[in-house]
Amino acid sequence: MPKGYIIVRVDVKDPEAYARYAAATADAVKKFGARPLVRGGKHEALEGTARARNVVMEFDSFEQARAYYYSPEYQAARQHRIGAADGEFVLVEGA
């Protein structure tokens, strides 16, 4: 079964609120078995506009990644991110 990935590209506007968001996601990350493959670090925009922070989370399946995003645990944590960062979240299925 192909793995699922959530790809996040954000520009953080409020580091304190974003830190609360990141800490609040811990329960959902553990519950859904998410594995962070990328969390920040060196990056280069090859095409398009770069974002300051890039994250890639791996899940056992597309469905598990989707369940993580829509879970009550993640949705509660997400409230800390609203207004703290601008960006995109994309759910993709691996090859």
Question: In which residue ranges do the predicted regions lie?
Answer:
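C-terminal structural segments of small proteins and small subunits
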Residues: 62-90
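Short S/T/G/P-rich N-terminal loop/turn motif that feeds into the first structured element of a domain
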Residues: 1-53, 58-70, 93-95
